[in-house]
Amino acid sequence: MKFKKTAACLAGLAFATGVVAKESNVGIFGTSGKGMGDHTYIAQDGPKADNIREVLSNVTLPEGFEINLYAIVPDARDMAMAPQGTALFVGTRKDKVWVISDRDRDGVADEVKDFAPSLTFDVPNGVQFTKDGFLYIAERNHVRLFPAAEYFFEGPDVVAVDI
C-alpha cells in the first residue's frame, strides 16, 4: 500500500513539476521533444508467418490442446500484459519495446509496433506493470516509468519518467 502511494505521489510530482529526465534526449515531462516520429510496424502475414504456422502444425500436443501463432515480434525477451488486457508489451535485448494489440480479441495480433519510438531504449529487456497501471521498463543502465502506457501506446511520444 505504501508503495502504491509513493508511486502515485512520484507520478503526480513528475506531472506537476515537469520532471526533466536524466537523458539528454528526453525533455520536460519525459517526452523526447523530437516530435511525433514514426512507428515501426511488423507484418503479421506473409512467408515468415506461414513458415511458423507450418512448424506449429507439426507440434504434437495432448488431446484438447492447440497451438497457434499469436504474433511475430523481433527479439522478444520479456512480456507484460496491460492490466485492462488491451495490449501486450514486449521487451528486447536490442533497442525497442514492442506493443501488441489484439483489438478484436480473437487470439491473434492485429498490430505489432514499437512503443514510444521518439525515445531511445538501451536493452529494454524488463517490462512490468503495477496493479495500478504504471509500466516500468528496466534497461541496461536505468529504469523508466510510463504512467498510463496502456492508454497512450497508440501515439509515438509518451510520458516517461526516469527512476
Residue positions per predicted region:
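Beta-propeller domains with acidic blade repeats across secreted/periplasmic ectodomains
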Residues: 22-163
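Gram-negative bacterial Sec-dependent N-terminal signal peptides
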Residues: 2-20
